[in-house]
């Protein structure tokens, strides 16, 4: 594992334990060159469906892209990284259970918006404003009105 401090590729594992969700392993490593310690996380590579993009392209599911988008929506909100990770864990579980070979970005986006709606309304509105690509302020206001009715 490459050291984030000095770039050396030799390190030793000094501690291993399951991560909080139990779906991976957290390892503490020590660089054999600079002796600094750092943490790595291992996860099982899941067999997830391909993501069908709006333009017809197919891409592998990328957890980091989903987390990045959700983090942007949750910026400056009282939502921890752990909560976001669990949200994405639930999304991945749902994708695996779907047994589909391909799944549209539209459906993934709807699932995320449902989770965010239940979690934090401001994060929901932020995510929806990007995901739904409102054509004008009226469409955006209509979404806000729907949110206020609930």
From Swiss-Prot:
A zinc finger (unnamed) spans 3-34. Binds 1 zinc ion. Negatively regulates transcription of bacterial ribonucleotide reductase nrd genes and operons by binding to NrdR-boxes. Its cofactor is Zn(2+). NCBIfam families: transcriptional regulator NrdR. Keywords: ATP-binding, DNA-binding, Metal-binding, Nucleotide-binding, Repressor, Transcription, Transcription regulation, Zinc, Zinc-finger. GO terms for biological process: negative regulation of DNA-templated transcription. It comes from Pelobacter propionicus (strain DSM 2379 / NBRC 103807 / OttBd1). Belongs to the NrdR family. HAMAP family: NrdR. Residues 1-26 are annotated as: Disordered. This is Transcriptional repressor NrdR. InterPro entries: ATP-cone_dom (IPR005144), NrdR-like_N (IPR055173), RNR_NrdR-like (IPR003796). It comes from the Bacteria. GO terms for molecular function: ATP binding; DNA binding; zinc ion binding. PANTHER family: TRANSCRIPTIONAL REPRESSOR NRDR (PTHR30455:SF2). Residues 49-139 form the ATP-cone domain.
